[in-house]
Every structure is written in structure tokens, then in C-alpha cells.
Amino acid sequence: ENVVAPAELPTDMNALKSQQFRWNKGGAETAKKIGLRVINAELPLRIKLHAVAHLFNTTNYIFILITAILSVPLLFIKNQVIDFNYFKYASIFLMGSIAIAYAYYISTLQREKTMRKTLSVYITRFPIFLAITMGMSLHNAWAVFRGWLGQQTAFVRTPKFNIVNGKDIWKNKKYTASKISPIVYLEGLFSLYFLSGIIMGFYYEDYGLLPFHMLAFSGFALIFYFSLKHSKLNS
């Protein structure tokens, strides 16, 4: 963890998407190719579990997307169907969220060193991370799905422009993408979909899913907005 490798992060939303598509599709293809071999290998259980979790971690985006889509009709069912009390048992699944939150807290603590700085950075950035992760779930789930289907796609490199300070320019470069993918418009529709979930929560005065729907709405809206904005800047 102390080995530093200088690298340039994606400078625009379309560059980030091309990187994420390549990583997630490649991860799914790798899991498809050697997943069963790892499961059947004569390895200690802890190593096998670690390997399987690492190989199949890209499928998380599929489950994030499915969970998000189902959350809106579930809110309606919860408030319209009589004696539908199964939701009180669903809180056990929050354990997964606690594990993720703790993992990112520890990584922030290792970087920031002091508790005060860690809490300041963590409280402001972790919700943004969750929102962006949810907003990218449609795009990344599509990449994973195509990887599992074995569909061949072109290898699209992440654009690099040697951006080292705020004065460097990445806009209108030939290497940047200007074409708008149909998925972008779906992301815009999903932002409206989760906005309806927020409105429904206030209508029913049921705020249990409100933070989840607010993160989903914010994430999809941000991804949609910056995908369009950066495409127009590069056209």
C-alpha cells in the first residue's frame, strides 16, 4: 500500500465511463473464464473466499441497480398493501453498508492521519462516493452483463492529457469522446424515476428509503448532467 505509481485520473465523465466499462467488463470476463477453476481448486477456504469475492466483485453493480429499481415499487407496496410487514426484517441487510462505510473510513484514516481531518473528509466525501457509485450502476452493470455474455468490444483507452495543474486544458481534444450513448438518456430517466421515489416518500410520510432515493437521484442526475456537458464541450 506504500508503493506509489504516478497516474492521471480521467478528466471528464466520458473518459471515466470508458475506463469503468473496460475494468468491469474485463472483470466479468475474467470471472467467467477462471471462476469455476478457483472454486474447485484445492485451496484453503479463506483464500478461496477472498479470490471469489475479488473475481466476482463487479457483479455488485448489477445488484445495486436491481435493488435501486425495486426500491420505488416496494415503497408503494409497503404503504398500500395491508399487513405487509416483511420490511422490518430487511434492516439486517444494512450490515453490508456498515462494512463498506467502515472500509472507506479506515482508508481515509490511513491517508489523513488525524481523526479530525479524517472525519471532515469522510463526512463530506463518502456520501458523494455512494451517490456516484449508484449513478454509475446502470453503465457498469451493462458492462458486466456484456462481459458475462462474452460479447466482444473494442478496447478503448482512457484519454490522457498530462494534466498536472488547473491551467492545463483537456477540452476539445481529438482524443475525447463527443458521441452521446443511449445509456446517458436512460440515466436521465432513472434520475426522474428516483425523484418520484423521493416525492412518494414525502407523500406517504415514510422516510425509511429517503436517504437511499436521494443518493440514487443525485448520482444519476450528476452522471447524466456531466455526460451531456462533457460531450458537448468535446463536440
Region annotations inferred by a language model:
Residues 57-154, 160, 181-235:
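Membrane-embedded multi-pass helical conduit in multi-pass membrane proteins
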Residues 1, 12, 141, 179-182:
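Alpha-helix initiation/capping motif
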Residues 1-99:
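Extended catalytic-interface subdomain
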Residues 7-26, 118-123, 127, 152-170:
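Nucleotide-sugar-dependent glycosyltransferase catalytic core
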Residues 11, 36, 114-115, 121, ...:
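General secondary-structure edge motif
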Residues 40-63, 163-195:
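Loop-to-transmembrane boundary segments
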